[in-house]
Structures are given as structure tokens and as C-alpha cells.
Amino acid sequence: MAVKEPVGIIGAGLIGLATARQLAQSGVPVVVWEKEAAVARHQSGHNSGVVHAGIYYQPGSAKAKNCRRGVELLRAYCAARGLPWDERGKLVVARDEIETQRLREIERRSQANGVPGVRWLDGPDIRALEPDVAGVSALLSPTTAIADFPAIARAYAADVTAAGGQIRMNSPVTAVRRHGDGVQVVTRGGTHTVSHLVICAGLQTDLLARAAGDEVAPEIVPFRGEYLRLRPEVRHKVHHLIYPVPDPAYPFLGVHLTPRIDGEADLGPNAVLALAREGYRWRDVSPRQLSRLARSTAFRRLAGQNWRAGLREMHGSVSRRAFLAEARTYLPWLEAGHVAAAPAGVRAQAVDPDGSLVDDFRIHRIGPVTAVRNAPSPAATASMAIAEQIVTELSPSNLRA
């Protein structure tokens, strides 16, 4: 017999749990289905740990608005829950005149987005702040922080259950179908009918959204982000987060140096096509995923437009020397012996039919279904703000007990 639940959520990552938390604390019965044995097992637990201040994003975009709102909510939440938060600050370093011009645009965006304390640095200012960093100019974002996102996800989950919500682990969703004015969700535990379904499934979102009646686009193409970890003897050389000026043609921030909340420091990530939806290693290969890519017009167009960049990223993946060469342009002291391999992550990158990478957050609403179709960085920072948006857009009739 079908079980009636008012609101269902697929995915126990940061956005799914933040949404469940807000619903449960508002008195709305909610159930979260998660295919893994623990929360935050994929993107939410495999990111760089950076709490972004909002300097990069197009003013007025969903990223800009949700990042600024999200960082304030998250800072207060971590303080209230006693979760670690380290406001290290970030330097975005320009290495030549072209990058300096791009950096001026980032400065303009940071001002338009209301990011506090951002200031311009010339070469001597950089060296005074970070003697081991090379650059001709930089932006300092003093409120950029690092945090423990897996711990934040666990805290969200504890809030959900404390408020009466349910989180069902080891519960992969095998089918989603519209049913009258609601949705049926099929798991190993049975068939569950919900008044509203929120899909926050990251790397699997496009497949589940289509099953629930959403359009094909955008498609998810998985990109693996690989990291190298600084050895203990050189971690002290840099205090701030150090980022290059991003190439505006790509929604990636480039290989950067990030101190982590546990005292480690990582260099990365690159952006390499993953051969499986959860392809954390080169040997993780899914014939089904490769078949999907081969049939995808969007992917073929993406590959055709960006094959040179793709080859460069693949070269950096198989050659540590090539990986380090990019970082040496602003960390000239870096040597191969200073780093070791670190765990990789996989980014769920949405791609439109014309082959363009979707940059902004994208959330679709299809009747009783909300599908988070694109939530790259800074989605972890913005998780509580995105949850606010999702819950606000649900009608009262969807939230009946």
C-alpha cells in the first residue's frame, strides 16, 4: 500500500538537508531519501571547504543573491552550533595585464554584490601580505572563509530528525512518476506518494527530473576535480586562500591553493571529464554513462567547442609536472616534492543543448516537482539561502500535513 508523505526530498547533500531542515522546523512532515549510507557523500563532501564571499558572480544573478544571503545565514548557523569557521581571506592574483583587466571586472562585481572589505593590491602590497606569492595585482577578499561542510551537513541532518523529519539512508530511488496531483517515489522500501517532491540529487538530478516530467535540458556532464595536497613542511608558506583570475569562458575558478579547516592545504582542482557519474578515479568507467555522452548532442557540441581546453586538463591530470606548472605562475617556489595526491571530487556540470556550460543556479518547477538542475559552487555556501527559496516557492497546499 502506498504511504502518504506531504513533502519528499531526494538527496541528503547540503541543499537537500537544508531544505528538509527548514520544512521540518516549520512543522511540515518531510522525508529524505538518500542512496548512500551517510549524508554528504558526493559533491557536498568532496569540495574545497571554501565559504565564498560572492565576489565573482554577475550582479543580480541567482548565484550573487544566494551567496550573499547564504554566507550570512551559514556564519550565524556555524556560530550557534559551534562548528568550525576560519575567516582566512582570499587573494585573487593577476599574473599579467590581461588578467589585471579581468580583475577590475571582478572588483566591480564584488562592489555591486555588496561584498565587505574587498580591496585592490598592487605587486608590493601582495608581497607584504604574502611574500611567497607572485603577481602584478590582486584583490583581497578578507571575509572569504573555510569551513567543514560534511560537519555542517551532519548538523543539518540532526536538525531534521530533531524536528520530526525522516532521513532514510541506503534508499536509492528507482522510479519517479507523476500520480494525480502528487508524485510517486519508488524505493526498495516501497512506493511513497508525496504532495511535492524536491529533487536535490546532484550528479543524478537530470535523470530523476526527466522521470518526474521535466524537460531533458540541461544535461549533467560529470567533471572530476583532482587535487594535490601540500606536504607539512611547506603548508606555512601561504596563509590566505590563493586563486588565479578565472578565464571568463569557463565556469571554473582555476587551480588554486586552499588551506583546509583540518590544517591541510590543497592545490586544485582541475576539471577533467569523468567517465562515470561518480567517477572519482580514471579507472571508474561506466559504459552506460559513456553511451549517454555519445548520444548527447549537447555533449558533442561542448566537446567540439572546448576540445583544446579538454586536452589541456587531461594533460594536467596525467602529468603532475603539467598540473604544477599552472600553479607555479603565482607560487614560483612550488616543486614536485612539495605535494602528494589528495582525494578528488566530481562536479555535476549542467550543459545546455547548444553545448554551453550553465553558469548560474537553475531550479525548475514542474507542478508538484521542484528540481535543482544546476547547483555548482557556491551552492555549499548558499545552501540555506537556496533552501529558503525552494520552501518559499512551495504553495501552502503542498505543505499540508
Predicted regions and their residues:
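Glycine-rich FAD pyrophosphate-binding loop
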Residues: 24-46
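Helical element adjacent to the flavin cofactor pocket in flavoenzyme catalytic cores
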Residues: 139-196, 207, 384-393
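C-terminal catalytic lobe of FAD-dependent flavoproteins
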Residues: 297, 302-401
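N-terminal Rossmann-like FAD-binding beta1-loop-alpha1 element of flavoenzymes
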Residues: 5-32
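Dinucleotide-binding Rossmann-like beta1-alpha1 core, especially the glycine-rich loop
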Residues: 49-125, 135, 254-255, 264-266, ...
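Conserved Rossmann-like nucleotide-cofactor binding loop
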Residues: 15, 38, 204
